Amino acid sequence: MIYNNSQKKAVMHTTGPMMVLAGPGSGKTAVITGRTCQLVTSGISASRILVVTFTRAAAKEMKERYLKAMGKTSTQVTFGTFHGVFYAILRHTYRMSGNNILSEEEKKRLMRELVNHYARDLEEEDLEENLAREISTVKNNQIPLEHYYSACMPQEKFREIYEAYEKWRKENKKLDFDDLMVQCKRLFLERPEVLRAWQQKFQYILIDEFQDISPVQYEIVRMLALPENNLFIVGDDDQSIYQVRGAKPEIMLNFPKDYPGAAQVVLDKNYRSTEFIVKRSQCLIHHNKKRYEKAISTDNEKGAPVAIRGYKNPREEMRAVAEELREAEKNGCPYEEMALLFRTNLGCRTAVEELMEAQIPFQMRDALPDLYDHWIAKDLLTYLNLAMGSRKRGEFLKIANRPNRYLSRDAFEEATVSFDALLEYYEEKDWMCQRIRKLEQDITTLTHLSPFGAVNYIRYAIGYEQYVKEYAAYRHLKEDDLISVLDELQEAAKSQKSIEGWFAHIEEYQQKMKEKQKQRAESAEGVMVSTLHSVKGLEYDKVYLLDVNEGVMPYQKAVLAEAIEEERRMFYVGMTRARKELTLCYVEERFEKKVEPSRFLDEVIQ
């Protein structure tokens, strides 16, 4: 392997702490592999070396590259993830087994049960997922429960659920992935002799993607690295995009303070992208204030200029992009070398529907959220089901008081509901009979409307949107988040000619999504459709960043300066996935409302 000067300095580093700032496409994996080889070649025992990364796939790749470089089939060097290493330490001390680890499936099931028991009244999309993430945040950052304020539910409810979760976990002798870290830290603090044994075992520690480290992971690593502090960290503060998972970019920014005199090197040569892409991405990221200054350059060709394109709306945007994808494939660029990147996975939906319609093969990095599975969508589709003749008790109960009509569950006695029976139940209350007749009239009206007209009628004439606003206020949720679901549904309804046709389309769409989910693990065919979070570490010849608008990139929830900096880092990660061609697309209107291009577009061209 031929190294440039910066890479060589990193690979040849011997003892003491070192920070390697590795820009995109700068060969960081080669450097970590190379230094591991160099340590072993110089006489360091392979069993004394620990190489840590964040995913099993990355650890596997690192190990394979090391074995190939050394011409071996096995090694005593430990390659693993943080969770894997901490589990091995705990297993060795406490004789644990895999049965003590709470699997993701078990955790999901437990979250579902806890939400059903403690928070059944909260109808929020992704509540279980958000709850699991918040529990993880509390553990990762070691926040006292009384000082943590949940964003997804009232404080008392969150504390009740957290305590019930911990009680169940302890009674069943289970540890979740975050507990592995917390327990490992506790073990090292309470049993110095155990810590000393592992310090002697791992005398050289190399960490990949250091910008994504959490406070508790860093505390354990610092203990483990003592007393020699042979800690070799590799990362890029400009690519720190996982604060939502507990990562703290300031840990890397403060590394020189924690280790005064630590050696530093910048891998500033990009071997991946064209000169245009490197320059434009640098223009963007230089707008961040809290970062290490770097001058990334490339010896690659100039390439095509970074394209910035505006479209009337997301549907037109995707149709134009789909046509370009087809044309590029005809001209020799495989679909697998093209990627469509979005800020959120909800943003991927229009792309997926358009690619299905255009019969362009695609693959996904994320589990795509099903718009039609959202509780708001289910309510609207229930109204439409009733318009198509359904009279099931369960469906009436779902929408009876959305908006509030003060209808009692007791009024719906039979499995099949009739309006005559409802009128009879309330015969002594004229004002209730008026409400029932109005509901019957509304359902009849829906039968004569197009899907778009029907959604519009439910929103405004029936008063469902007002109900959603009141619900958001009562639950202290962002009103815009819920209204955007109604907007998405109305947009989806536009292209449908009949309610029956829309239901058939939804069924087909959901079936294809299930197939894609099954294929996700083994399939690597077609255009990549992904969020910016999930595409990190990957690269493609031709990349599109879509919906580059204010409120999307940067995301509407990013208000504070540090949140905007994280959004900019995310955009930077997206831009630097491209090898040869990069296109940034924005729209002029969304849901028939004018929207502004992202501020990031101005920063790219400055």
Q: Whereabouts are the PLM-identified features?
A:
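Helicase P-loop NTPase motor core
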Residues: 24-32, 260-263, 268-361, 388-389
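A basic/glycine-biased coupling hinge at the interface between accessory DNA-binding modules
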Residues: 15-16, 26, 37-188, 192-200, ...
